[in-house]
Amino acid sequence: MFRWGIIFLVIALIAAALGFGGLAGTAAWAAKVVFVVGIVIFLISLFTGRKKL
């Protein structure tokens, strides 16, 4: 999950450096969404724990 966030962040930085503002904004937004979803899933798994079968 965090790997995808970092990939989108790198894409946003490269696009911004090359002058593609719209693409950079979209990639940065996607990176934020992926990071938030990853953190939420991490917190849910942290609080629920492993269930014994």
From Swiss-Prot:
GO cellular component, one term: plasma membrane
Source superkingdom: Bacteria
Keyword Hydrolase part of the UniProt annotation: no
TM stretches of this protein: 4-24, 27-47
Membrane topology annotation: Multi-pass membrane protein
Subcellular localization(s) per the UniProt record: Cell membrane
Major place of residence: membrane
The entry's keywords: Cell membrane, Membrane, Transmembrane, Transmembrane helix
Lineage of origin: Bacteria, Pseudomonadati, Pseudomonadota, Gammaproteobacteria, Enterobacterales
Family: Belongs to the UPF0391 family.
Protein name per the record: UPF0391 membrane protein ETA_06630
Keyword set includes Membrane: yes
